[in-house]
């Protein structure tokens, strides 16, 4: 399932991944937890499915969600082995999510990604460990959004600007397009997904 969460986010549907992670109704991880699961069921309806067709002992529930949380919500992605170079690229398009606080210990020290946002503004604090560098994706097309002389504009990519950042502590404050995440395309309509899809 962790591949599903990451692929949904990669396709621009982090909102659906977030619903699967945060809802307590069927089908979702929260539904499994509400029914007492500590590991992922083979089927979304593992509590009512034929027991001969359903294993209730797959990966620990948090195992899948933590990978997605660190990679896609906090934005920690290794560009080189052992995070010698880090890509900070959270999915800011999930409108239902207003903040994330995360840290991870690497061989070079602790990296941190703490952000909070409204529909129109982002405040983001990051820590890049000593002897490492990072590429930071900001959800703005303004090539002058960052004033820090140590931070270098690299390129535009999609709805983001990419910046080269050396080790240290940084605070980014940028205006965001309020339509970010509103015009999603791909997979299926939300109404179909939750009202008509035949999930097992």
Which residues fall in each region the model found?
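Alpha-helical support elements that line or immediately flank enzyme active sites
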Residues: 1-11, 134-140
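Non-catalytic C-terminal accessory modules of carbohydrate-active enzymes
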Residues: 15-200
